[in-house]
Amino acid sequence: MASRKTISFVTGNKNKLKEVQQFLHGSSSINITSVPLDLPEYQGEPDDVSKQKCAEASKQLSGPVLIEDTCLCFNAMGGLPGPYVKWFLEKLGPEGIYKMLDGWEDKSGYALCTFAYSNGLQGDDVLLFRGKCEGTIVPPRGPRTFGWDPCFQPNGFNETYAEMSSELKNSISHRGKALEALSEYFKEKNCD
């Protein structure tokens, strides 16, 4: 029997780790561990930021790594706050995120998740796995346990991410879609 491949997921967020482990739980040969690593905050487009963070993490840890970068993008603001949503959320909270759109009629937006994976071998490309979910920015509803989930309502649903069961959220969310793409990659590489 082959040994399990350990991949370091660079996060200090236990909720994110749990979500990733739940989604990839069927993989018998992959072990996802959490490594809280302080990486530089790169500026730029989501794909570029993800690649830079993953390459730096792989260099520091000398092995296979997985990083996740999430954006919340408002259509009225040309995609902002985008990859900078973390900083807005820390300063404003979910209520402030919603109030950012006070001056606009258009409250539509999308959540974008990018997982970047490096096998840890120098010279190999960083691979990206993306998921996107269209929705509306609404007044916060539901538990405040997971970032901006209380103010994002996916199209076709009457609940915010925060009000949904984890099973439903994982099946439709930007992160769930990105994890599905990642899972398919590991299946193709016979890592499960």
From Swiss-Prot:
This is Inosine triphosphate pyrophosphatase. One of its GO terms (cellular component) is cytoplasm. It catalyses: ITP + H2O = IMP + diphosphate + H(+); dITP + H2O = dIMP + diphosphate + H(+); XTP + H2O = XMP + diphosphate + H(+). Binds 1 divalent metal cation per subunit; can use either Mg(2+) or Mn(2+). The keyword Manganese applies. It comes from Ciona intestinalis. The keyword Hydrolase applies. Homodimer. SUPFAM superfamilies: ITPase-like (SSF52972). Belongs to the HAM1 NTPase family. Pfam families: Ham1p_like. It is found in: Cytoplasm. Its cofactor is Mg(2+); Mn(2+). GO terms for biological process: deoxyribonucleoside triphosphate catabolic process; nucleoside triphosphate catabolic process; nucleotide metabolic process. Transmembrane segments: none annotated. Pyrophosphatase that hydrolyzes non-canonical purine nucleotides such as inosine triphosphate (ITP), deoxyinosine triphosphate (dITP) or xanthosine 5'-triphosphate (XTP) to their respective monophosphate derivatives. The enzyme does not distinguish between the deoxy- and ribose forms. Probably excludes non-canonical purines from RNA and DNA precursor pools, thus preventing their incorporation into RNA and DNA and avoiding chromosomal lesions. Its EC number is 3.6.1.66. Its main location: cytoplasm. It is an enzyme of class 3 (hydrolase). InterPro entries: ITPase, ITPase-like_fam, RdgB/HAM1. ITP binds at residues 11-16, 53, 69-70, 86, 146-149, 169, 174-175. Keywords: Cytoplasm, Hydrolase, Magnesium, Manganese, Metal-binding, Nucleotide metabolism, Nucleotide-binding.
